[in-house]
Amino acid sequence: LMLPAILAGRPVLDTITLYFDQMGSVGSALNYNSPSIFAFARDVSDEALAAKLGTAAAFTLMFAVFAWFWWRRSSITNWALLGGALILVVGIPFLLPHMHDRYFYAADILSLAFAVAAPAYFFLPLLCEFASLLGYHAYLKMRYLLLMHWGAAALAFVLIVALVFTAAQLHPVRRQKYS
C-alpha cells in the first residue's frame, strides 16, 4: 500500500508514519454518512462508550469468524471462505465507529463477486450498492437521499444472509453446492 506513494515521490518516513500522524484527527461523530450500526442511533448520550462498544463488537465479530473457521477447519470450502470474507468486509465497518462511506467499498466489490459466483444471491450487491449510494449521495450532494438507517438495515440483512450462508457451508450436513 505504501509503494505507490513512495514511487510517486513521497518520503519513506512520511509514508510510514502517515497514519500515526492522523490518529488524533478523527472527529467525535460516531457516523460520517455511512450505513453503519450507528446510523440507527441519532442521540447517543455517551459517544465515547458507544465508540468503545462498537470497536469491541467489531473485534468480537472478527475473532468469532476466525475462531469459527479454526473450529470447522476440516469443513472449509471456497464457498465458506467467500461467505466468511463477506461477513468481515460488511461486518467490520458496519460495527466500527467513525466510519465513512468509502469503508464499504470492499463490501460492494465482494458482494458483486459473490453474486456472480452464486446467482441466487443476486440481491446482495443490490443491497450493498443501495447502502453505498445513500452514503455517497449524502457526501456528494450535501443532503440525504433517504435516511441512512435504511442503508444500515440493508447491510444488516446482507450480514445475516452471509452468516447463514457461511454456517450452511461450514456444517457439512447442510452444505449446498453452487457450481
What are these regions (language model features)?
Residues 1, 112-120:
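Hydrophobic transmembrane alpha-helices
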Residues 2, 6, 10-11, 17-95:
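Aromatic/glycine/proline-enriched transmembrane-helix motif characteristic
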Residues 11, 15, 102-105:
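Membrane-spanning helices that line or support transport/gating and their immediate boundary helices
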Residues 15-37, 68, 85, 118-179:
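Transmembrane helical bundles and short interhelical boundary loops of multi-pass, membrane-embedded
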Residues 79, 93-101, 116-118:
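Short, contiguous acidic/charged loop-to-helix segments that flank catalytic cores in large enzymes
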Residues 96-107, 140-148:
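Membrane-interface catalytic loops of GT-C/OST-like multi-pass glycosylation enzymes that act
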Residues 105-109, 127-128:
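Hydrophobic core segments of alpha-helical transmembrane domains in multi-pass membrane proteins
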Residues 109-113, 157:
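Alpha-helical transmembrane segments of multi-pass membrane proteins
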